[in-house]
């Protein structure tokens, strides 16, 4: 009698649900998964090594390109590690701006996750709705940095520039008539803070729309309830962080447990799941968007009332104002030295971690006193989550792998580094 053997199948890397360049080698018994072996490295760009050959400031744009949907939060961990080594205190206004943009980035990330996850499972409408809101938040990025994605806005000692007094406006085109242009620019007449405040007022109703489409949807629940269950003890043992850990019922959030910047002044709650399945992780991320909206609103209120510096007043770390640079030779020298040679960071080592939309994102920096990092290690939250894919998908069907990859919120820029 012929021996019955398991069937091996490649899932990805050219697969719409592979979230980039994931290659999975699946061992199947019929349609039931016996083993899932993730193959990574297809997006490896040697970011850690490249940073060793750049000055501390030149390595900053690499951070945007790690998890390329949570750009500013990546930068935040990097600049915090440098600030620890330098021993400098960031101005209060810059801290509030950072916290506000961290939360804007969290909403940006979760909107993309929600749209892509729903699309993978078969719900297309949510994808279109989510991208409608992402457009407004991308415009906030563009207003402060000039770029919609790779902002390079956070700097050691503060932020690149203060919040602008006016928003970029949509320009007339032959496809849009005057009344359309007027309505599109209606909420862009004021400052960036006015625009963000208007967004925070509208956003809860948009989240309600997503929930109407998914939360009680029979098909969505059949595809996510009881899929990819991880017990709280196992989640901790596997190194889960962020929504993956909180979805399993562990209340751990660096913004509350190890507060950085001005998070201890913020009033917000930590959503926690109970069952540790795909559905609970969906509910956690939905509620996180609502809590981020609360934090953004608090930051807007504070920033309106409190003008002030947004960079440390130390020209070894931050460039002098352009007006001074054009009138004062000493300031010109400071500017030239900072952007050619870079800052010399005292010898030592530092680890800085932030509550990234995907989990705990950490940067470990070692300095030997030179103007370049001696060593940089990136702690990517998605790396630990992808390791658990085998365990989470065993005993499930092939179709459930798509839901499990979606719930992990995988982005290969940070995993392969």
Curated annotation (Swiss-Prot):
Native source organism of the sequence: Thiobacillus denitrificans (strain ATCC 25259 / T1)
Catalytic activity: a quinone + NADH + 5 H(+)(in) = a quinol + NAD(+) + 4 H(+)(out)
PROSITE patterns per UniProt: COMPLEX1_49K
Homology family: Belongs to the complex I 49 kDa subunit family.
Top-level enzyme category: translocase
InterPro entries: NADH_Q_OxRdtase_suD, NADH_UbQ_OxRdtase_49kDa_CS, NDH1_su_D/H, NiFe-Hase_large
EC number per UniProt: 7.1.1.-
Subunit structure as annotated in this protein's UniProt entry: NDH-1 is composed of 14 different subunits. Subunits NuoB, C, D, E, F, and G constitute the peripheral sector of the complex.
Topology with respect to the bilayer: Peripheral membrane protein
PANTHER family documented for this protein: NADH DEHYDROGENASE [UBIQUINONE] IRON-SULFUR PROTEIN 2, MITOCHONDRIAL, NADH-UBIQUINONE OXIDOREDUCTASE 49 KDA SUBUNIT
UniProt keywords, alphabetically: Cell inner membrane, Cell membrane, Membrane, NAD, Quinone, Translocase, Transport, Ubiquinone
Job description of the protein: NDH-1 shuttles electrons from NADH, via FMN and iron-sulfur (Fe-S) centers, to quinones in the respiratory chain. The immediate electron acceptor for the enzyme in this species is believed to be ubiquinone. Couples the redox reaction to proton translocation (for every two electrons transferred, four hydrogen ions are translocated across the cytoplasmic membrane), and thus conserves the redox energy in a proton gradient.
GO molecular function: NAD binding; NADH:ubiquinone reductase (non-electrogenic) activity; quinone binding
GO cellular component: plasma membrane
Protein name: NADH-quinone oxidoreductase subunit D
Entry's localization field: Cell inner membrane
